[in-house]
Structures are given as C-alpha cells and as structure tokens.
Amino acid sequence: MNNLQKQFPHISIKLNEPLSKYTYTKTGGNADIFVMPKSIEETQEIVSYCYQNTIPLTVLGNGSNLIIKDGGIRGVIVHLDLLQTIERKNTQIIAMSGAKLIDTAKFALGESLSGLEFACGIPGSIGGALHMNAGAYGGEISDVLEAATVLTPYGELKKLKRSELKAAYRFSTIAEKNYIVLDATFSLELEDKNIIQAKMDELTAARESKQPLEYPSCGSVFKRPPGHFAGKLIQDSGLQGHIIGGAQVSLKHAGFIVNIGNATATDYMNLIAHVQQTVREKFDVELETEVKIIGED
C-alpha cells in the first residue's frame, strides 16, 4: 500500500474500503486497496504497475449487476467512476467507461440521436455494459457499438473496431480477453426528439411496472435459458417470495433477488444456489447466472 501511494501520490487510493458502498445490493466485503483514477493515463499507470508487480487487479464499474462476496477482494480494485465524459461527433456518441448507460441514453436524446432507447433504464456503466453486452427490450449494446478503447491486462492501449468486438447474448470479446474498457463509440441515427422520448417513456413505464426498483438488487440474476424464461421457471417452482437471511426472490419479478433488509452476499449466494437446485430438480433446466460474482468468502 505504501509503495503504491508513493508511486502514485496524485491518485486517490484508499485502504480497506467497504465495497458495499459501491454495489446495488448494498453487500460485499472490503477492498484491500481501492483506487479511483481520474483519467485514461492514470488508469494505464495503475494497470501497468499492478501487472509488473504481480498485484491482483479487479475493475469495478457501477456495481449494478454484481455480487461481491463478504470476504471482499484482495489486491487492487480500480473504480472507474470518475471517467464520465460523454460527447458527440457527428451522429456518433463517445462515452467514457465510468459514464452511466442511463446518462448516455439521455445525452443521445438531447442530441436527437436514436439507437440507445433500450438502455434508458439499465443502471450500469458503459464499461460494464460492453463487458457483458448489456441489453433490454429487444436491444443490445452490440447493436450500436462502433468501436472501443481498451487496456489489456498488462496495460497496453488498444483501439478495437466493430469487426473485432464480437458479441453474443451476455457475452463479449472484452470479457473473454479480460480487457478493461476506457471508452466506447456508438453509431446512432438522427430522429425527432419527441419520437425518441416517447419510446423511452414507454420502456421506462414497462420497467417500473415489472421490476422491483423499490429494493436494492443486482438486476437480472439469471441468463435466459434456451426455450424458457428464468423468472417463469422460478415462479413455477414455487420460489417467488422465498427468503434466505435478508435476500428474497422478488414478489414483483421472480428473476430478481432483492435485499429486503441487511442481506449479506452469502444470503444472496445461498438463495441463488437454492433457486438453481430447485429449478434443476423440477424442470431439469440449468439456470446460469447473469450477475457477475467476485471476491472471497
């Protein structure tokens, strides 16, 4: 820790930082070393230093589709929340990794650019969205993603073109190669602002009516199994409302697990395992987690 602070006195570095402050579930242990770079250059410095000194490094985005275990995370956490610039270039939008997806969709609306309406309610960061090819209501990030600037795990800066950014359902080249997203370029289309707003209002209303936004949660917990819907399988298994500790299968949407009061990451993990086992026994279907789970028990 002292070496890191001496090496980078210009960068915000905290010791034993509670990660529950940075996750939507309000759960998770502490980070040994918590770093918040203010620029691409600072991010590259930290990543290169950790690689050269064999220090474990984990990147944290908006913490919205994430469970951090109660034992926390060893090594260095790099939180990219300060990299939030969003700008327009012709009919393209360039957003930095820490920018919120919702804010980027609103920025596009303000510029009369269509294509990100589906993202108007997704509570993730640009970096996290690219990592998992986030999507909702028939749209995915890969539909509009033109290019991305990334860091390799050893700190090399790379520009990836659309053809290099292979993506599938909740999968991307970025995740496969463990790249760190620095910014993303989206190709959009000019459209009447009122038409864009109407579509966003429609999707927001649908989201509010179906999802348990009144409780802390990690968003959609499970991927959609082929030929099924995870929420329907969970509901038909009689698990809607099931509670372990402070974690509950949402009464509003069975595909969500909410924190109804002082839940721990262990509560979440135990409830996820119980749901998977029950659905497997009843329907012979494997539920694969969409939520990313990291850290130590």
From Swiss-Prot:
Residues 27-191 form the FAD-binding PCMH-type domain. It is found in: Cytoplasm. InterPro entries: FAD-bd_PCMH (IPR016166), FAD-bd_PCMH-like_sf (IPR036318), FAD-bd_PCMH_sub1 (IPR016167), FAD-bd_PCMH_sub2 (IPR016169), MurB (IPR003170), MurB_C (IPR011601), MurB_C_sf (IPR036635), Oxid_FAD_bind_N (IPR006094). Its main location: cytoplasm. Its cofactor is FAD. GO terms for biological process: cell division; cell wall organization; peptidoglycan biosynthetic process; regulation of cell shape. The active site is at residues 170, 220, 290. One of its GO terms (cellular component) is cytosol. It catalyses: UDP-N-acetyl-alpha-D-muramate + NADP(+) = UDP-N-acetyl-3-O-(1-carboxyvinyl)-alpha-D-glucosamine + NADPH + H(+). Its EC number is 1.3.1.98. Pathway: Cell wall biogenesis; peptidoglycan biosynthesis. GO terms for molecular function: FAD binding; UDP-N-acetylmuramate dehydrogenase activity. Keywords: Cell cycle, Cell division, Cell shape, Cell wall biogenesis/degradation, Cytoplasm, FAD, Flavoprotein, NADP, Oxidoreductase, Peptidoglycan synthesis. It comes from the Bacteria. PROSITE patterns: FAD_PCMH. Belongs to the MurB family. NCBIfam families: murB, PRK13905.1. Cell wall formation. This is UDP-N-acetylenolpyruvoylglucosamine reductase. The gene is murB.
